Amino acid sequence: MGMVNEITNKLIDIKGRIAFEHKDYIIYIDNSRKKEVDSGDIQIFKDRKQVYDFSIAYPSKECKSKGIYNNTKDKFINNIDLEKLHEIIMTTGL
């Protein structure tokens, strides 16, 4: 859970929606619904094609757990995708 914690801790304070370029990727983060459901979304594009579509569960008063769900594969993130997402997110200037 170390990488999941690092990613969620880096993204939890983002308000609303942001989009930016980083390396060869366009990254779109949407935390606009975080107050309602304690979750956000990350979409990552490369060469105008969506390569990742994740949902993030942030901790709340009712539920302290965190998680990253791969919407494309309809299951929680696997280690390969987690390592790639970690590499992308942790090297941004957020």
List the model feature ranges, each with a label.
Residues 25-30, 43, 50-51, 76, ...:
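A general secondary-structure boundary signal
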Residues 19, 41-43, 67:
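Residue-level detector of beta-strand face positions
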Residues 17, 46-50, 84-85:
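Gram-negative host-targeted secretion-system effectors, predominantly Type III and Type IV
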Residues 1-36, 74-75:
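Negatively charged, low-complexity tracts enriched in Asp/Glu with abundant Ser/Thr
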Residues 36-59:
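A short, structured beta-strand/loop element
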Residues 2-10, 52-94:
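Mixed-charge, Lys/Arg-enriched low-complexity segments
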Residues 21-23, 30-32, 45, 57-59, ...:
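A structural detector for beta-sheet-dominated domains
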